[in-house]
């Protein structure tokens, strides 16, 4: 099984070819092909290589499937005995990527 651990949009993701993942909003168009170069670890059928912190000459190719919004997060703040209440909500903008290939 081939997989990689990459760093993208401030988080680390375990990615495998043929699967899609949701990243924080990226400034790309749907249908574009992009290369993710911050690869921290790669497993090529049992042969594990770890970077310090990143691997050189290794990249993950992905296709942008589209943009979407995450689930609504509700934030509720209140101060007891003061009648101060504040309710807010937001939805995070996401970009869905299909992992095509891991090139090492």
UniProtKB/Swiss-Prot annotation:
It is found in: Plastid, Chloroplast. GO terms for molecular function: rRNA binding; structural constituent of ribosome. SUPFAM superfamilies: L21p-like. InterPro entries: bL21-like (IPR028909), bL21-like_sf (IPR036164), Ribosomal_bL21 (IPR001787), Ribosomal_bL21_CS (IPR018258). PROSITE patterns: RIBOSOMAL_L21. Signal peptide: none annotated. The keyword Plastid applies. Its main location: plastid. It holds the Pfam family Ribosomal_L21p. One of its GO terms (cellular component) is chloroplast. GO terms for biological process: translation. Keywords: Chloroplast, Plastid, Ribonucleoprotein, Ribosomal protein, RNA-binding, rRNA-binding. It comes from the Eukaryota. HAMAP family: Ribosomal_bL21. NCBIfam families: L21. Part of the 50S ribosomal subunit. This protein binds to 23S rRNA. Belongs to the bacterial ribosomal protein bL21 family. This is Large ribosomal subunit protein bL21c. It comes from Guillardia theta (Cryptophyte).
């Amino acid at each position: 099984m081939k997989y990689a651990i990459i760093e993208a949009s401030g988080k680390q993701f375990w990615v495998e070819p043929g699967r899609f993942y949701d990243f924080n909003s990226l400034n790309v168009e749907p249908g574009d092909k992009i290369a993710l170069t911050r690869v921290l670890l790669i497993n090529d059928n049992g042969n594990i290589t770890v970077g310090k912190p990143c691997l050189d000459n290794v990249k993950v190719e992905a296709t942008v499937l589209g943009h979407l919004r995450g689930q609504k997060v509700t934030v509720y703040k209140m101060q007891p005995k003061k009648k101060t209440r504040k309710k807010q909500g937001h939805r995070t903008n996401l970009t869905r990527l299909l992992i095509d290939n891991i090139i090492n």
